[in-house]
Amino acid sequence: MEKKKVVLAYSGGLDTSVAIKWLQEKNYDIIALCLDLGEGKDLAFVKEKALSVGAIKSYMIDVQEEYANEYALIAMQAHTLYEGKYPLVSALSRPLIAKKLVEIAEQEGASAVAHGCTGKGNDQVRFEVSIQALNPYLEVIAPVREWKWSREEEIAYAKENDIPIPINLDSPFSIDQNLWGRSNECGILEDPWAAPPEEAYEMTLALEDTPNKPEFVEIGFEAGVPTTLNGTAYSLSELIKTLNALAGKHGVGRIDHVENRLVGIKSREVYECPAAMTLITAHKELEDLTLVKEVAHFKPMIEQKLTELIYNGLWFSPLKQALNAFLQETQKNVTGTVRVKLFKGHAIVEGRKSEYSLYDEKLATYTAQDEFNHDAAVGFISLFGLPTKVYSQVNQKKVEA
């Protein structure tokens, strides 16, 4: 029987390494795909490991700039904080991984794609809904969900088949990291009463260890896109990396969150998102300066829906595309510079300026330079309050009757 081809989203960890052998036993030729999303791993090693375990071909693709400009940027502009806390670190990367899986599958003539998600997480939904949206004819295989092995059984299978066991297997934590941040779950973190141990963190310093003097950074934006730090131009991916280091040094971006998962359970996770939280804070302040009131008040409703769609794996849905079109329209004048103070876990905006600023000091001031027409207030109040006045008059007459 001729073997079918499957493209596997490969991380180099135990699950996806075991999945290569498991898929071989199902009569598949495996093409491994590993993406560089800015997590800082030795991906050349991961690429070679896939081949050594049994893949017939192994891809390693650097998608950092694509991820920054087409995914993280939208999240920043939409101030996406799921349940007011989580900046969608993992949720943002899944549609891009799905997109690349489909592209390689079509390029290689594969009939299926595979991922390493379990049956109780959000990522299985995000991957499979995205893949269906991009190519509904591809079969999707989820080995970890199908084999239902315990961790001990999986390790035994790996040893039987000479699959290398990762040296960090004894770590109690399950970690996912990319440019936009780092998520951490499992181990002691599963107890919502337990304080996260310091070893759960990597991108940020504990407040006790942060500098005792604040650091100031000026972030330049052009049409809603961060382009400079302290006057130096960066590509977006490099800007995010640089700001991760700057803000992380001051303990910015630690998040401890009990969240409501898409699959119906609550999960306690610890996130580190120094650049994401700093950029979202700065961008919001620049919008406050440049957006008209009606747009500024309506946009949070769009942001909330976009956040839900992205978290739930609906990146490629028609509604997400429509809402994104609105989002991009709002960014045309979001150009300027924001000064942020980084200190003891906080990113505090202390100044903002823009050539498109709608703040007019001559109208806002209470000094002798005031140019606001105070006489216009009387007529405005009369008209603005007229419906309330009429309502009160009508109901007062009924009471008197």
From Swiss-Prot:
The keyword Acyltransferase does not apply. One of its GO terms (biological process) is argininosuccinate metabolic process. ATP binds at A9, Y10, S11, G12, G13, L14, D15, T16, S17, G116. InterPro entries: Arginosuc_syn_C, Arginosuc_syn_N, Arginosuc_synth, Arginosuc_synth_CS, Arginosuc_synth_type_1_subfam, AS_cat/multimer_dom_body, Rossmann-like_a/b/a_fold. It catalyses: L-citrulline + L-aspartate + ATP = 2-(N(omega)-L-arginino)succinate + AMP + diphosphate + H(+). L-citrulline binds at Y86, N122, R126, S174, S183, E259, Y271. L-aspartate binds at T118, N122, D123. Its EC number is 6.3.4.5. It is found in: Cytoplasm. CDD domains: ASS (cd01999). Pathway: Amino-acid biosynthesis; L-arginine biosynthesis; L-arginine from L-ornithine and carbamoyl phosphate: step 2/3. GO terms for molecular function: argininosuccinate synthase activity; ATP binding. One of its GO terms (cellular component) is cytoplasm. Keywords: Amino-acid biosynthesis, Arginine biosynthesis, ATP-binding, Cytoplasm, Ligase, Nucleotide-binding. Belongs to the argininosuccinate synthase family. Type 1 subfamily. NCBIfam families: argG (TIGR00032), PRK00509.1 (NF001770). PANTHER family: ARGININOSUCCINATE SYNTHASE. Homotetramer. This is Argininosuccinate synthase. The lineage of its organism: Bacteria, Bacillati, Bacillota, Bacilli, Bacillales.
